[in-house]
Amino acid sequence: MARKSVIQREKKRQKLEQKYHLIRRSSKKEISKVPSLSDKWEIHGKLESLPRNSAPIRLHRRCFSTGRPRANYRDFGLSGHILREMVHACFLPGATRSSW
């Protein structure tokens, strides 16, 4: 299981990303529309002044139950080994084990 501080840090990043999402998106659209290079640099400076953790690329998907950052299935929000355990225990309706 991931440390609680790492999970809290990820939650903080999610809040920052939601807070600055509209500002970041509007600035990027503005850069593509402005023809002069000096204006683009000004807008780019505004983007750089935003907090680094507000960028969506810095977010990780984490397992809902363990907080594991790797091997996550988006549909379930779980990591692979937890998903497998839950399917074997019949906690996920409709999911079947593969057999061939």
Curated annotation (Swiss-Prot):
Entry's Gene Ontology cellular component terms? chloroplast; small ribosomal subunit
Tell me where it mainly resides: plastid
Write out the entry's keywords from A to Z: Chloroplast, Plastid, Ribonucleoprotein, Ribosomal protein, RNA-binding, rRNA-binding
Kindly list the biological process annotations in GO that this record carries.
translation
Entry GO MF terms:
rRNA binding; structural constituent of ribosome
Subcellular locations according to the entry: Plastid, Chloroplast
Question: Which InterPro entries does the entry link to?
Answer: Ribosomal_uS14, Ribosomal_uS14_bac/plastid, Ribosomal_uS14_CS
Q: Write down a Pfam family by its short name.
A: Ribosomal_S14
User: Which regions span the lipid bilayer?
Assistant: none
State the source organism's domain of life: Eukaryota
Q: Could you describe the subunit structure of this protein?
A: Part of the 30S ribosomal subunit.
Record-stated family? Belongs to the universal ribosomal protein uS14 family.
Which NCBIfam families does the UniProt record give? PRK08881.1
Q: What does this protein do?
A: Binds 16S rRNA, required for the assembly of 30S particles.
Which protein are we looking at? Small ribosomal subunit protein uS14c
Source organism per entry reads Phaseolus vulgaris
Q: Which gene encodes it?
A: rps14
